[in-house]
């Protein structure tokens, strides 16, 4: 009987994910959800004071109404001020919930936590690289996640395609990124967190499955920002064909 259970467990890990650690992560995600919801409410009020009256809608993009492009500079300034304040409070608090990441391509919607400590952070969900930035600061934000254990949020990271959108919902704003390319790098290659001169999102996970020898990395560029209380998203990246995957 024990042998059968072991085979079943191994099969679940190979074809799905580790069920034991996934239960733990599901519990942590549930516990963090109400805490994060309260944080969103608090920052919504702060953002309303920051941005003032909502912008009028003008035109559509991808089915979503967007505000005039001329407003992007002021929205980015507001986002930066809010992000700086948020970072000053949350940076370095290992395991604390920061926001949510949504990737429709792989059916992902999960809470992101601070830092990439194995037990203190990544056991709860994807974690923000502490040496990286925060969305809205105009630099590179990195998020790492497991592929086989602890709910395996990035198990299907290699299914994400160039041109896909990645939405990061922070208490101070919603940031939509457009995927530019992907790379497979050595596990110790930190060039993925280089400065690029624009607001970039980097996702990484161990590669191949069941190995930590390399990392599969997704690079995406900020496309639009929606501050809490604002009526619409504001496009900050001119429409152009996505960069061919490398």
Predicted regions mapped to residue ranges:
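Solvent-exposed, non-transmembrane regions of membrane-associated and secreted proteins
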Residues: 3-246
């Amino acid at each position: 009987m024990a042998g059968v259970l072991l085979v079943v467990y191994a099969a679940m890990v190979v074809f799905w994910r580790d069920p034991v650690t996934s239960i733990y992560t599901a519990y942590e995600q549930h516990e963090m959800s109400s805490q994060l919801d309260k944080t969103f409410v608090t920052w919504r009020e702060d953002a309303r004071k920051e941005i003032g009256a909502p912008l009028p809608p003008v035109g559509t993009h991808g089915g979503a109404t967007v505000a005039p492009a001329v407003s992007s500079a002021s929205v980015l300034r507001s986002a930066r001020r809010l992000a700086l304040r948020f970072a000053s409070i949350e940076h370095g608090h290992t395991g604390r919930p920061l926001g949510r990441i949504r990737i429709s391509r792989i059916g992902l919607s999960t809470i992101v936590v601070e830092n990439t400590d194995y037990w203190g952070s990544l056991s709860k969900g994807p974690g923000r690289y502490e040496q990286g930035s925060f969305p809205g600061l105009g630099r590179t934000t990195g998020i790492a996640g497991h592929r086989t254990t602890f709910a395996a949020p990035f198990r299907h990271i290699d299914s994400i395609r160039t041109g896909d959108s990645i939405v990061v919902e922070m208490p101070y704003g919603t940031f939509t990124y457009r995927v530019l390319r992907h790379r497979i790098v050595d596990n110790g290659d930190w060039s993925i967190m280089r400065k690029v001169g624009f607001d970039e999102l980097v996702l990484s996970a161990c590669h191949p499955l069941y190995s930590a020898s390399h990392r599969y990395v997704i690079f995406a560029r900020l496309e639009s920002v929606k501050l809490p209380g604002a009526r619409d998203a504001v496009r900050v990246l001119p429409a152009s064909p996505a960069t061919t995957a490398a």
